Amino acid sequence: MIATAPDERINRVSRTPSSLARERMLSRRGEPLFLADWMRVLMIHFEVDASELQRVVPYQLDLHDERAFVSLVAFTMENMHPRLGGKLGAWLFNPIATHDFLNVRTYVRHNGEPGIHFLAEWLSSWLAVQLGPRTFGLPYRHGRICYQHDLEQGCLVGRVEDVKRGNHLKYRAEAVLGAPFAPCERGSLDEWLMERYTAFNAVGHTRRFFRVWHPPWPQCAAQVKLEDLSLLQDNWDCFKEARLVGANFSPGLHDVWMGRPHCA
């Protein structure tokens, strides 16, 4: 599925989070900055204690029915390149164009705009880890990551190890073979968790945000077995009493729009 711009018919249908995100993205000149493919995406959702979580988040939490959530997003980013620059730009970005991610994100609202805040992001690319904090204010960490997200073979397995500390995340997941991939039901908790398009982050006293855009996630429900949570429990107290509430798998999206960093 290609994240190409929808035509004018989008103005004649109900306003989805995706359509609103596209409007916000294009309200700034020069956007988007990058394009990339976000592939074989597994999102695992936890409910956590809101007051415990708020202590480590520099933005106001966005709650759903007074409940706070943290999600893990395990995926492979492929073919990241500047929107402009053609083959030369793609060649220059080749060393960091493709790598695995584990995002640990929570849900915030800033100046009336819903978004996410990354508690941490583990990347398999050492070079990308050096660049992210300097440019986007992102909390990158280096990880040894092994994903086998092959739904057709019934295999959704992941292992992430922090290179410095050695703690792990290990999981196995299942989804119904042949289940249709479709956007989340409008107004559902799944939509609230998955359809987020602005990232608010901070380094020291400097707050930044950037926006992304893509069509609504094509997804299906997944069932997850967590085998090792030390990567999370050793870093955040709120995970010691966290409750697994669900998971979603998506085959991914091509040509996701990724915006520039801005002051929040």
Functional labels for PLM-detected ranges:
Residues M25-L26, P32-D150:
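Structured, non-membrane catalytic/scaffold regions adjacent to prosthetic-group chemistry
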